[in-house]
Amino acid sequence: MADPTELLHGTLDTLVLKTLAWGPRHGYAIARWLEAMGTDVLKIEEGSLYPALYRLERRGWIEAEWGLSETRRKVKLYRLTDAGRARLAVETAQWSRFADTVARILNAPTSVTS
């Protein structure tokens, strides 16, 4: 299998949008949730996450505001915008189609010829 870091590079924006679909979160919480859901496959580095957050904010798909964490520390909370929700729907449909196609190819019998 390819290096999970390489696979993550092309999907991190979509995964962040999905994480924020459940409500506002700060960067550390986003990373921990993705790692928990990705079991041993996903490792989210700050050097990847924060550029993704800034990129998504510039595109208008998320917005940020200062708030308090569960431990009452000041944190930047990210929230999905309506445009981000629409983008997530598009990305989800594209990934579902792509994953179905890859699964069909990988599960095809090896004796099939064209």
Question: Predicted segment positions?
Answer:
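Basic, amphipathic "hinge/linker" alpha-helix immediately C-terminal to the N-terminal HTH DNA-binding motif
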Residues: 73-92
